[in-house]
Design a protein with these regions (language model features):
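Extended amphipathic alpha-helical segments enriched in small hydrophobics
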Residues: 300-308
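Cysteine-centered nucleophilic/redox motifs
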Residues: 315
Length: 332
């Protein structure tokens, strides 16, 4: 099969299926200079006269790059990426009290924001109540203070949790905050199986890059795999972890090291879940990632593409995952 054959097959299957579900936002996409941006570019073998001249198979091209929406997802997990749907837009926000942060969230949603991203203060991040002496001077400083279910109710007052997705940047006490969130949603009358959002829940990068851990590694990993198991059965649309390279890069790593350490952490989480008795395809589709977007554009593009391909191959070949959703590296 030639590269052209592969390209046409992609258009007739993967792309068509995607467009049948989500039409592109407009008929023509252009740069600021008015130059049309093609849906997909492939090598031109006919001196500028287009891809129809390609008649020789290029297995290396297909195996390494392929087409968006298909294994190994080097060029993206969605066939049209953001030509059909925008990413969820949410400003990282949270400060002072739950009541004050709630006002901010409702304002942001009224301005067109399509999701919420909760910033917690340091006492909350390391499991201290606001009235603990060690928390003095830090309550509500770099995020919102949450000590109780009442605080969580105030945080999401008048915000229907079954209609908005919520990202919570919380790690060591992630299970507690997620339980509070689900409880508030239930009190609102929501079905927890329909809830959408993300908890960061990446304790390994806290040990090496950031520092807001509470427990030793082994029990911390147990908490994380318990969350994997619970959510796979009860909250299937929730991203149970955001495996983070961002903080590793900010702590001084290179782009290559960022990908290496992040994927190593991802492998550790998958291995822990398998050791706990979970089936890989039951939880892998709920794993997400968080990478840095640094200054060198081409290096960052290459980093993202390499990470997608490596993760897809790790999940399919090393862990024998069968579902395409288990192979896809979804990140922000």
């Amino acid at each position: 099969m030639t590269l052209l054959d592969q390209f046409n097959k992609w258009k007739e299957t993967t792309l068509k299926k995607s467009l049948d579900k989500f039409k592109e936002r407009k008929g023509r996409f252009e740069t600021s200079a008015g130059i049309e941006v093609p849906r997909l570019a492939i090598p031109d073998g006919n001196e500028g006269r287009g891809p129809l001249a390609l008649t020789v198979a290029d297995e290396n091209y297909v195996n390494k790059l392929g087409f968006p929406g298909e294994f190994p997802y080097t060029r993206g997990v969605q066939p049209t990426m953001y030509r059909s749907r925008f990413w969820t837009m949410r400003q990282y926000a949270g400060f002072s009290t739950a009541e004050e942060s709630n006002k901010r969230y409702r304002y942001l949603l009224a301005q067109g924001q399509t999701g919420l991203s909760v910033a917690f203060d340091l006492p909350t991040q390391i499991g201290y109540d606001a009235d603990d002496p060690i928390a003095q001077g830090e309550v509500g400083k770099v995020g919102v203070s949450i000590s109780s279910i009442k605080d969580m109710e105030q945080l999401f007052d008048q915000i229907p949790l079954d209609k908005v997705s919520t990202s919570m940047t919380i790690n060591a006490p992630a299970g507690v905050l997620l339980a509070m969130y689900i409880a508030v949603a239930k009190r609102q009358g929501a079905d927890m199986r329909e809830l959408r959002g993300t908890i960061q829940n990446d304790i390994l990068k806290e040990y090496v890059a950031r520092g807001t851990y509470i427990f030793p590694p082994a029990p911390s990993m147990r908490l994380i795999t318990d969350i994997f198991q619970f959510c796979s059965k009860e909250v299937p649309y929730w991203n149970t972890i955001s495996i983070s390279g961002y903080h590793i890069r900010e702590a001084g790593s290179t782009a290559v090291q960022e990908v290496a350490f992040t994927l190593a952490n991802g492998i550790a989480y998958v291995e822990a879940a398998l050791k706990a008795g979970l089936n890989v395809d039951d939880f892998a589709g709920q794993l997400s990632f968080f990478f840095n977007a640094h200054n060198n554009l081409l290096e960052e593009v290459a980093k993202f593409r390499a990470a997608r391909r490596m993760w897809a191959k790790i999940m399919r070949e090393r862990f024998k995952a069968q579902k395409p959703s288990s192979w896809q590296l979804r990140f922000h």
